[in-house]
Amino acid sequence: GKIDYLFQEQAYQMQNLSIDSMAFSVFDIDILEGSNEFLNLNSRKVAITRRAAQRMFGNESPIGKEIYVSYNPTKPLTICAVVSEWPEHSNFNYDFIDRCYPNDRWGSSGWQTLVRLQENVSSEAFAEKIAKMVIDVPDSNNWQLKDWIATPLTQLRYDHPIANTKVKFQHVVLFAIAS
């Protein structure tokens, strides 16, 4: 989500993406400069896109710069990498990338899980199998994936948008004119 990143007492509202190392095998993210230390658990390191680095630091290299996040202004984060950005029309926009932290509590719903299926696997059959899974959770009546939605990534933006988009009357008029 959007976070206020602080540098030299100036706030920059930026989009954050928390990932694990498998994201590099699924998505086209390149480390252009620096290291992948931002993927280490508890490293306090982050990666920044070229566009965000230009906005915050101008032509200076961002590597090694310490920044803060507004919700934790006493513990610095160190920029250790510059990464490529995606086109702006994406469900997963980002200015900064950091490591997602595992949450082993059942029912935790702070993450989206993306799965890459092999070419010969039916997405419908996969979704049916997952929906029928019952997970044995100690001290509970088991747990089932009730709100499971399987959507091809290419259709996600249209079928299940992540952001709550507010459509204004002007949008309706523009689409009516365009059609």
Located regions from the model:
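Active-site loop of classical SDR/Rossmann-like NAD(P)-dependent oxidoreductases
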Residues: 10-18
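Hydrophobic alpha-helical transmembrane segments of multi-pass inner-membrane transport and secretion
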Residues: 166-179
